[in-house]
Amino acid sequence: MESTVEREAWKAHVAMIGVQLFNGGYHVITKVALNVGVNQLVFCVFRDLIALSILAPLAYIRDKRTRPPLNRQFLLAFFFLGLTGIFGNQLLFLIGLNYTNPTYAAAIQPSIPVFTFILALIMGTERLNLFKLEGQAKVGGTLICVAGAVLMVLFRGLALFGETEAESLGHGESRHTETSGHFMSGFFNGLGRWNLGVLCLIGNCTCMAAFLAIQAPVLKKYPANLSVTAYSYFFGTMFMVTSAFFMTNESTNWSLTRSEFFAVVYAGVIASALNYGLLTWSNKILGPSLVALYNPLQPAASAFLSRIFLGSPIYLGSILGGCAIIAGLYSVTWASYKEKKAAAAMAVIPITSKEAEPLIYKDHKNKPIGHLFTKSPISSPKSDD
């Protein structure tokens, strides 16, 4: 039995590593598609339609017996889940990616659990005790993570790996960056494209955090996880299709080249349908704290893949800010894990406490069937006669 549980846990760990690698590949592939010139709204529409066509039938078959009936409260919750987690999350991410690069886009993503904790604290679904080490670790980790995000916005630094700023002026990525190589110039000369991209990425993380904060209480009342995802994609796709209908005037925007078609298929099948399925399955086995610990792998995977396939430079600011974000994330997730572990231990105390022992062992003749001990803990001496 233990070996089976251990095998399932190892499979979940491998699955989470795959999820982060798939997300890193998504950042690189979509950056290539955006450089070609695909419309962001059109890209999101095709991606969501593909994901919805996969998730809807799977949710109908898999959650057929566990899916509760729909009501107005659930529909309203799915509406906001689609608005934040699908529509706002995806669109802001693509706009931010178009103005920055895959390394920065992936480096900000690990802040999602921290933003989720802040929103959950405001909503009352998360508790905070500053007199305990876990509570102090949560606050300290949040501050460190925010400081890392601010550092990435205000400081770029030297190109430690890859081409320098002068050497990369001919590439598509540099067309979206400041020629001075520093972000502070954008605050004096107006908001630059790179600064706008970073703000969109922060908005992307905020939308995803709101999605997770709203989803947590919904899943308690609507335990069909895959159906929740499918309904969220339904409303998000409706938002995306409606926006694309009014904001894209030329029919040529809906035509895809070969590379764009490959990016759309990858985004819909791998980055959406498969990743959401693996996240849900791994969350049931490992729990949310351990699953969140794998998010810091995303910047490393994206930086490595973008350096190989795009030749994107890796700057000092991204390394320092990314390290701060990862450190803050680990602090928050460690504190959450310790709190849940302590709560689980407190739940076992009434069963294993000494006060309960006399009720079990006082009369060994009336002990329950299937007790762990086959003999009485206090054996009577046998007569020598």
Swiss-Prot record:
Residues 23-153, 216-333 form the EamA domain. Disulfide bonds: none annotated. It comes from the Eukaryota. GO terms for cellular component: membrane. Pfam families: EamA (PF00892). It is a multi-pass membrane protein. The chain crosses the membrane at residues 14-34, 41-61, 75-95, 104-124, 141-161, 194-214, 226-246, 261-281, 285-305, 308-328. It is found in: Membrane. Keywords: Membrane, Repeat, Transmembrane, Transmembrane helix. One of its GO terms (molecular function) is transmembrane transporter activity. Belongs to the drug/metabolite transporter (DMT) superfamily. Plant drug/metabolite exporter (P-DME) (TC 2.A.7.4) family. This is WAT1-related protein At3g45870. It comes from Arabidopsis thaliana. The lineage of its organism: Eukaryota, Viridiplantae, Streptophyta, Embryophyta, Tracheophyta.
